[in-house]
Amino acid sequence: MLEQWQIDQYHEQGYLVVNAVLTDKEVADLQADFDAWVEESRSHDAPWGDTIDGRARFDIEEDHTPEHPSLRRVTSPTEISEAFKRTALESKVAQMAGQLIGGHGARLHHSKINSKLPHTATQVKWHQDFPFTPHSNDDLVTCLLMISDVTPENGPLQVIPGSHKGTLFSHWNNERFTGYVKPEIEQEYCQNPVSCYGPSGSVCFMHTRLLHASSPNETEFPRTLFISVFAAEDALPFGENPLPSLHTGTLVWGKESGEIRSTPNTLKLPQKPKGASFFVQQAGKDSIAE
């Protein structure tokens, strides 16, 4: 489990990378399921599969072809894979997230896979997670488990250390929730990022307010992340869950307090995308406001 210096670093910098959180066998089980979904994607030319809110479970990039698959998102893999369910609800990932959140306990909010297969165009613009998942307090941790090796070259997460202590920026542009900060904010605050990478089985724990982004993968090697978001058990969610799941709200650490804790934050509630993922939202191609 985490030592105090790691917990202190997380709260000071807004992120923490820990190697060897999962065993090789645990990672191999996750990789096997994901590889099967990539193979399945070769027979599709549009997002497919069903989730509990009616949107597609599997999302593909515009450059996807049978010969060059570009599966970029699997929503709520915990619902279709025992390996992913165990990882999100019972593994050291959840326990460490609980340590970082502190307080009485922690719940799973949602989970997803974000993938960048070799030479694919998937990128993520600068944003904070909290505007997507606002709660009564901001004790939320985004846990990015590296299923594949993540290197400085294959599109790693980039973060701005300490930005979780600063402004909660608007992610609205031209009356639409686009899911990224305005260009002038990026220019002023996002010029000296730090890349987060490590061998498979590593986890980057990230505060929900931390500014982050990532670039396309232009290498021969995949970059696959299983992302689980955990919230303090006394954090009441505001608005719709963008990725609702059968496992949303599951207590993974600690106990119930029966309380709701509030901290002062001001933001406009997000629009929930109609498309398969927030990638279409960031690209301005979602039909939510049309």
Regions from the PLM with identified roles:
Residues 1-12, 19-126, 132, 241, ...:
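Non-heme Fe(II)-dependent double-stranded beta-helix
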Residues 118, 160-167, 229-235:
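Short edge-strand/loop segments of extracellular domains
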Residues 129-131, 140, 208, 213-217:
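Glycine-rich phosphate/pyrophosphate-binding beta-alpha loops
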Residues 103-106, 130-135, 147-156, 162-164:
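Active-site region of the double-stranded beta-helix
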Residues 134-152, 197-198, 229-232:
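Short, conserved beta-strand element in jelly-roll/cupin
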